[in-house]
């Protein structure tokens, strides 16, 4: 089955061609801060379409035992903004995906009760791209007047110029093992009730690399931080020059620990009539131990910490199958789920909010053992405020001051083939 998770691409009118300043796209160091209520919506384009494969295989061993294997590659979230959007310092592009391999079994204990379990191997990947604004970082690291002082020293030939913007990229890889267990109760030949539980997934060994695009100006500024006047004046300004220079090294090893939520699910299936099936599902996911924090491997210094105070997600879904003809089945579904981040802590690279799911589809069965399914769905996400989170640390990577509204709506197609 080909399936799609939460996917969105925001206004993406940009070029990926780099320039001599080490930037992916046109220069944006123009002092733009944005205006309160500025709106960022998804824009269709070639890079907002993703192909996400999935595979499921079930093999009956005997009348009571079935073993199965599944694999999926899911984009948990894809966001991309223009280079010049005012919140670019907090992250203008993010790609989070988890590839999961499952091996499991189902066993029928009695005519009305079955149990099942699976083990999973999960591969984690995250990529974040931000625009590093040196002038903004300098103004936040030192007391008021620091940038003016450095500009004066530059005019006197005593310091290099404060560099313009450049791209910084963070790539993280990791893996984890997990398991899931469930049971299925069939009180009648028309009704099935299922429940399952999956514990938290702990990616404790995620590592990767922080890359800062370097040019002549950034190299000269990093050298200035390592010595010269900054060795004398830095302590007076409360700035540790050598430490700041180390934080700006072009290549640094990075690490992250992240916990994905546990999940409890209960579902109901009822064969109402020869033509109509009814379904309902409730899902509970506890995100309260999830956090976004990235550190340097060499010294443990924080690259970025994004406090978001994640909450519990409750999801409700209902659906039906209607069979107008022997070989054709129509599907319809609706779902709703609360967001896990409040307005005051929502960040651009994770603009999560309350959402609703709408889906329509059809299955055609040309032969007894073959079914082809096609579906269309809409994820309708409430527009959410971004840019209010003032708790991002260190302060120099908190991004420019901006207040905006992001809309994560997305559409997707699903194609399935069962043999």
Segments predicted by a language model, with ranges:
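Short secondary-structure capping/turn segments at boundaries of alpha-helices and beta-strands
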Residues: 1, 43-44, 53-56
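Outer-membrane beta-barrel porins/channels
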Residues: 18-31, 49-419
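Glycine- and acidic-residue-biased ligand/ion/polar-headgroup-sensing regions
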Residues: 2-6
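Surface-exposed strand-loop-strand hairpins of Gram-negative outer-membrane beta-barrel proteins
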Residues: 7-48
């Amino acid at each position: 089955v080909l399936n799609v998770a939460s996917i969105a691409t925001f206004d993406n009118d940009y070029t990926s061609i780099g320039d001599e300043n080490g930037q992916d796209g046109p220069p944006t160091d123009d002092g733009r801060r944005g205006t309160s209520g500025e709106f960022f919506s998804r824009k269709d384009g070639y890079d907002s379409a993703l192909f996400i494969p999935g595979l499921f295989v079930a093999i009956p061993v005997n009348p009571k035992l079935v073993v199965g294997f599944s694999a999926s590659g899911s984009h948990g979230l894809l966001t991309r903004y223009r280079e010049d959007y005012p919140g670019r310092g907090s992250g203008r592009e993010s790609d989070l995906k988890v590839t999961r391999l499952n091996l499991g079994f189902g066993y029928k204990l009695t005519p009305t009760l079955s149990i099942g379990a699976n083990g999973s191997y999960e591969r984690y990947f995250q990529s974040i791209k931000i625009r590093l604004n040196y002038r903004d970082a300098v103004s936040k690291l030192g007391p008021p007047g620091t940038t003016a002082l450095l500009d004066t020293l530059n005019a006197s030939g005593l310091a290099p110029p404060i560099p313009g913007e450049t791209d910084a990229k963070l790539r993280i890889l990791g893996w984890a093992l997990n398991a899931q267990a469930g049971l299925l109760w069939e009180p009648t030949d028309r009704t099935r009730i299922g429940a399952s539980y999956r514990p938290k997934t702990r990616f404790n060994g995620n590592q990767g690399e922080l890359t800062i695009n370097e040019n002549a100006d950034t190299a000269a500024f990093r050298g200035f931080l390592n010595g010269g006047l900054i060795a004398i004046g830095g302590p007076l300004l409360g700035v540790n020059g050598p430490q700041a220079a180390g934080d700006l090294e072009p290549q640094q090893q990075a690490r992250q620990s992240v916990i994905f939520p546990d999940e409890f699910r209960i579902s109901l299936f009822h064969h109402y009539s020869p033509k109509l099936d009814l379904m309902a599902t409730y899902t509970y996911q506890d995100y309260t131990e999830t956090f976004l924090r990235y550190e340097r491997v060499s010294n443990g210094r924080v690259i970025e910490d994004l406090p978001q105070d994640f909450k519990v997600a409750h999801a409700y879904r209902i659906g039906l199958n209607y069979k107008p003809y022997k070989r054709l089945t129509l599907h319809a579904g609706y779902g709703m789920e609360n967001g896990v981040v409040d307005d005051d802590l929502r960040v651009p690279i994770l603009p999560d909010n309350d959402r609703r799911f709408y889906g329509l589809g059809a299955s055609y069965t040309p032969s007894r053992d073959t079914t082809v399914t096609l579906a269309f769905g809409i994820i309708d996400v409430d527009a959410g405020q971004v840019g209010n989170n003032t708790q991002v640390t260190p302060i120099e990577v908190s991004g420019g001051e901006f207040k905006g509204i992001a809309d994560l709506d997305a559409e997707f197609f699903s194609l399935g083939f069962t043999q």
